[in-house]
């Protein structure tokens, strides 16, 4: 069983959204079978993203070299921009998410998803991909969004991606994915929040 100390947030970028700079976090999880990376941030800006004014903080080379497994919560540009750093490695994603990303040119930056050596492992529903690491569908932000549940000795921890932009939004439980996370009552990280917390449902 993992410890929550095995989970480390990594600031991968920040973007301009709603007039403010929003951080974009990814996470590493130390695991006996190798380092797991949840989301990959952004490696470089792209002309299509000019309005977001992204500032990218590429993953350290030594971290990239250690990664054994990649998980995408979803395939929007700020969560999959570093996927191409991992040709040949398994990248776990919900099948619906990958299909949607490939079907709509406005969904993401296509070449950041489909690159030479891309090896996607598609899932349909909840699955344990490594002992103590589960993928849980959490639709809402996108139809194929998923969260990562780490079964830690202190209790489960959730790496939530964009299941919500903020804990205030998460607490309202307006989407199916948000309600699933709230039901877990677990310590939760969000991609645009700097610290984790146990979310509380709000009326």
Regions from the PLM with identified roles:
Residues 81-87, 199-202:
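Metal-dependent catalytic neighborhoods of phosphoester/phosphodiester hydrolases
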Residues 34-36, 69, 155-159:
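Structural motif
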Residues 1-55, 182-184, 200-203:
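Zn-dependent metallo-beta-lactamase
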Residues 42-49, 57-78, 85, 90-137, 143-203:
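Metallo-beta-lactamase
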Residues 21-23, 121-123, 142-144:
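Residues that act as N-cap/strand-start positions at coil-to-secondary-structure junctions
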Residues 14-15, 34, 42-45, 77-78, ...:
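Short, solvent-exposed loop/turn segments at secondary-structure junctions
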């Amino acid at each position: 069983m993992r410890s929550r100390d095995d989970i480390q947030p990594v600031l991968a970028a920040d973007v301009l959204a709603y007039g403010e700079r929003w951080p974009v976090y990814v996470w590493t999880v130390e695991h006996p079978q190798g380092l797991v990376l949840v989301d990959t941030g952004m490696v470089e800006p792209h002309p299509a993203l000019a309005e977001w004014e992204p500032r990218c903080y590429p993953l350290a080379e030594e971290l990239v070299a250690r990664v054994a497994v990649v998980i995408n919560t979803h395939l929007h540009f700020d969560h999959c921009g570093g996927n191409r750093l991992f040709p040949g490695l398994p990248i776990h994603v919900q099948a619906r998410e990958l299909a949607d990303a490939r079907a709509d040119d406005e969904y993401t930056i296509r070449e950041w998803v489909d690159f030479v050596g891309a090896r996607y492992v598609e899932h349909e529903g909840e699955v344990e991909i490594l002992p103590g690491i589960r993928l849980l569908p959490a639709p809402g932000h996108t139809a194929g969004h998923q969260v990562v549940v780490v079964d830690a000795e202190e209790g489960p921890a959730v790496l939530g991606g964009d299941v919500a932009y903020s804990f205030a939004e998460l607490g309202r439980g307006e989407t199916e994915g948000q309600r699933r996370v709230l039901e877990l009552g677990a310590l939760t990280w969000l991609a645009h929040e700097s610290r984790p917390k146990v979310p509380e449902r709000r009326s």
